[in-house]
Each structure stands twice: as C-alpha cells, then as structure tokens.
Curated annotation (Swiss-Prot):
Residues joined by cross-link Glycyl lysine isopeptide (Lys-Gly) (interchain with G-Cter in URM1): K241, K350, K351
Organism annotation: Saccharomyces cerevisiae (strain ATCC 204508 / S288c)
A GO MF label: tRNA binding
Phylogenetic placement of the source organism: Eukaryota, Fungi, Dikarya, Ascomycota, Saccharomycotina
Alphabetized UniProt keyword annotations: Aminoacyl-tRNA synthetase, ATP-binding, Cytoplasm, Isopeptide bond, Ligase, Nucleotide-binding, Protein biosynthesis, Ubl conjugation
GO biological process: cytoplasmic translation; positive regulation of tRNA methylation; seryl-tRNA aminoacylation
Designated gene of the protein: SES1
Protein name, per record: Serine--tRNA ligase, cytoplasmic
Amino acid sequence: MLDINQFIEDKGGNPELIRQSQKARNASVEIVDEIISDYKDWVKTRFELDELNKKFNKLQKDIGLKFKNKEDASGLLAEKEKLTQQKKELTEKEQQEDKDLKKKVFQVGNIVHPSVVVSNDEENNELVRTWKPEDLEAVGPIASVTGKPASLSHHEILLRLDGYDPDRGVKICGHRGYFFRNYGVFLNQALINYGLQFLAAKGYIPLQAPVMMNKELMSKTAQLSEFDEELYKVIDGEDEKYLIATSEQPISAYHSGEWFEKPQEQLPIHYVGYSSCFRREAGSHGKDAWGVFRVHAFEKIEQFVITEPEKSWEEFEKMISYSEEFYKSLKLPYRIVGIVSGELNNAAAKKYDLEAWFPYQKEYKELVSCSNCTDYQSRNLEIRCGIKKMGDREKKYVHCLNSTLAATQRALCCILENYQTEDGLVVPEVLRKYIPGEPEFLPFVNELPKNSTSSKDKKKKN
C-alpha cells in the first residue's frame, strides 16, 4: 500500500501524482480526494481524543488529590464516569475511521513508473525486444528446434507420449484436472530441477515455500480481487487459510516485521522459490482449455528479490535478463513486452512479460511476468531498511521484486510444440541429465483419438 503521507501535501505528499497514476491505471481518481477528506476527519477525531485524554488524566490527578486530602470527590467521580463513556465512544470512532481510511488506501495502486505505456488496451503493450535461435529464419508453424512442421498441439504430443491422462484427472478433481504419467512426470520434474539449479548457480537462495497462508498475511500481499478470482480457501473450524497462487506470496511475507539496519551489507537478497501453486482461474473460463497450459494446480520456480530502493530498477533488469537466459538455453523463441498501465496489478509499478512462441497455435503466449513492486508490499508487511536519520520525514522500506522463472507446466507446453517431430519428441539438451537414462529422444507410443484438436483443424482446412 502507499504511504498515507503521499496523499497529504502538508506532509510532503503529492496527491496529483497519485491521481495521474490512478488515471493511467483506469482506476478511480475520486478515491484520492475521498482519502484526503477521510484523513482530515480522522485527524480531527484524533485531536479530540487526545484533548479528551488530557482532560481525563488531569481529572484523575484531581481525584487523587481529593482522596489524599480526604475531601469529597463524588462530583469529580461522576464527571469521570461521564468522560469514560465519552472516551470509549470517541476511541471506537477513531479506530473505525482509521480502519476505513486504511481500507481505502489499500485500494489505490502503486505509482505507475513514467516509462510505462499509458493505455487500458493490452494490444498497446510495448514490444521491448525479441529473440530466436540464430538458425531459425522466422517464427511460424515450424517447430523452432527440430525444423519440422508443428502438426500437433502440446497436449496432443503429451497424449502420444503417454505423458498425461486428462480424462481420469477430470474424473477425480473436475475441470482442468490431469495426471502426469511416465515421461510427463520426468519432463516436468526436469524443468523444476533445472530451474532451481540455474538460479542457485547465480547466487539465489533456494526456498521451498509453504502452500498455505493465514488470512492476515495473505491480505497484506494479495489484492482484494485475487481473493475472488484466484485463491482457494481452506477452513478448519475457525482457522481460515488460503492456498497460495504463487510462492511470491509467502516469500514476500518471509521477512515481515523485520528491519535490515545495515542494508549495504545485508541487501540485496535473492531467493529462488519453489512450490506447488493453486489458482481458481474464475475469470478465465474457457480460456486456454487445452492440456496443462492453464490449470488449477501447477509447479512454479519464482525469483524474489529484496533490495535497497536505490538499486531496485537495476535488479528489475537483471531479473528479466535471467529469465531470458533460461529460455535461450531451452532455445525457445520469445519476445519481451512492457505491460500497459491499465493492465498492471495494484502492487506493480512496472511489469515485463516474456511471451514464448507456440508454433502450432501460431502465437506468443505468456510464460514469465517480472514486476517491480517498489515499497508497495514492504510497507504493508513492515519490512524496513536503514536507520532513520534526524530530519527524515518517512521510514525507509525495502523494495520487493518478483519474476517467474518457469511455471513448469506452461514452459513444458512450449517445449513440446517446439521440439516435436513426426515420430516423437527431441529432449532439450539442458534437461536430459535430470531424466532417467538421459534420453535424447522420446518416441510416440499412442495414437490420437479421431476427434483430436489437430484432426479437427485438418477437417476445417479441407
């Protein structure tokens, strides 16, 4: 969340900057003035409460003197009873106003970085750069690694490898359910192990995150819309927890309430998080319904960085470069796009997506999101850095950044389409050592059902 002082000019804030940021996000601009008005009301109530406390404390002393001098204090005691009730009512009013004020501030997004394209249409996302293997003339309906026609979709390749079973998965857990089988298991695990080793070699500290979070901490790291569209709730009596949608959520809270007093020595910290992740995908009905590209349960390797504010943009570029290096090692064509202001989540000041090429579907699809959340998360989680010097108006908070390295099911889908041949799948060289027998090639063992996706597409063309 933003600092309330940023809304108040007398506190050194710049409410107009917040208004412009909200406008860029296509979000409520009016809420800024509502917050300013509510803040003034809260300050007034807080002042009245302070004055009442002073009056109450003086009355306490006067009563004490009456008792000490063995004088009648009945009048003062009656006044104390009256003030006690007033104090109770005013305290409740102040607490409610403070709660309502913070709730509104929490709805305001991070300040959009000046370099972000202002638009509410993702068609206007900025194309930052593209990459493809040197021996690939251009992306198209050809598997980029094998040079063979991409005649099958990723889920069909898995079916022909006997690598997954969607029918029994749906029977057991419902929509988008699946089992990995045989080499489907090994390929997914290979991506997990390769991703962990890849970032560990760059100095990242591996963390295997818990897959459930308590409501209090989840509410400090996830925005309200995610509770409705993404998160699964787990209830045990009165104990309420949420399944994580990404390891970013528990890792962002890993240092909650902590203070890095010597940031030049202690920061930056680079974490590589590994976890199973769970998403309801309530807002994605019917989207990417094929295979394991968009499912309710998946594994993900995540980058998470905690740094001094002065170095966060340097770390942002470094994180996306590591994700690029990872996909270059897998020889998957991709492009980097800067997400427009209206599509940013509340915490992100700027976000890059890495979209990789799927030759059967003839389109780029998102595999990576890399965000600089500046101090938006750390302020809510109270993760501070440095010693507050005399004259400083504000406490100094760390900056938090996150980036996917690989949501392994999605990355596997892209590998399947780009490494296919007529007879099977070439195994990416960097993954072979993580698979039993270190195979170079996996032959098809199953035929496709007559109503498969590619069969339907061929009928349409004919």
